[in-house]
Amino acid sequence: MSKANLVIYVISDSIGETAEQVAKAAVSQFKTEDYEIRRFPYINEKRQILEILEEAKNENAVIAFTIVISELREFLIEEAVHLNIPYADVITPILSAMESVLEIPAKKEPGLIRKLDERYFRKVEAIEFAVKYDDGKDTRGLKQADIVLTGISRTSKTPLSMYLAHKNLKVANVPLVPEVAPPRELFEINPKKIIGLTTNPVKLIEIRQERLKALGLKNEANYASMERIFEELEYADGIMKRLGCPVIDVSTKAIEESAGIILEIFKEMGHKFSNGK
């Protein structure tokens, strides 16, 4: 087999995707399709660098690398110069430019962008979880949830679930209605991961009346009557006492404040979530 006209050795202490994309962008500026890219990810030892360069010296090679560990980077450059192999340090120049502007040193930890991507996908997963297990639609999610919220209608269960999902937490919520028995799963899970939500009846009647107006319904509906609200609150209070779960009054609290209280409760209990926090 004949040699390629150009062999680009992509070397990285992470997966090497960044250096490979830069190499592809660079080679696209030339009228040639006779090239090959060889990627060497997770390089963290001098021995590995020597092995790669020993191979590269016999090719029409260029090295493109993203290595943030100073000792390894300097070793690679020294050996490439010694073997007369052209190289391009893809990441150091922009790190140096940013350090001069920010006036703080770069962390120089391999694979940080990958960790950011992982956090993003965990967040997406948590949001999808909150949607799937909202309003008791599927009680199988209660055992998988980091947090389970429960309370009567209009006690901020859904917005709180979504807010906490954006913090990478899997949250399910269960409505409490006097005419409907709570799902058995609610009593089978650890009560320490359940948070009960309650509210002031006067505040709740205002919220429910506004909800009825938005739906084009009359305020006389039982849903917004004080008698019905007292009945629901009393019923929910009984369920929460049976569960033995912490209860938060959300009457005068913004979603962010209620979420902060919930997280503080779990912190005090020393609870660890599925996201490791």
Curated annotation (Swiss-Prot):
Pfam families per the UniProt record, alphabetical: Kinase-PPPase (PF03618)
Keywords: Kinase, Nucleotide-binding, Serine/threonine-protein kinase, Transferase
Catalytic activity entry: N(tele)-phospho-L-histidyl/L-threonyl-[pyruvate, phosphate dikinase] + ADP = N(tele)-phospho-L-histidyl/O-phospho-L-threonyl-[pyruvate, phosphate dikinase] + AMP + H(+); N(tele)-phospho-L-histidyl/O-phospho-L-threonyl-[pyruvate, phosphate dikinase] + phosphate + H(+) = N(tele)-phospho-L-histidyl/L-threonyl-[pyruvate, phosphate dikinase] + diphosphate
Listed InterPro entries: Kinase-pyrophosphorylase, PPDK_reg
EC number in record: 2.7.11.32, 2.7.4.27
Cited function: Bifunctional serine/threonine kinase and phosphorylase involved in the regulation of the pyruvate, phosphate dikinase (PPDK) by catalyzing its phosphorylation/dephosphorylation.
PANTHER family tied to this protein: PYRUVATE, PHOSPHATE DIKINASE REGULATORY PROTEIN 1, CHLOROPLASTIC
Family indicated by similarity: Belongs to the pyruvate, phosphate/water dikinase regulatory protein family. PDRP subfamily.
Protein name: Putative pyruvate, phosphate dikinase regulatory protein
Species per Swiss-Prot/TrEMBL record: Alkaliphilus oremlandii (strain OhILAs) (Clostridium oremlandii (strain OhILAs))
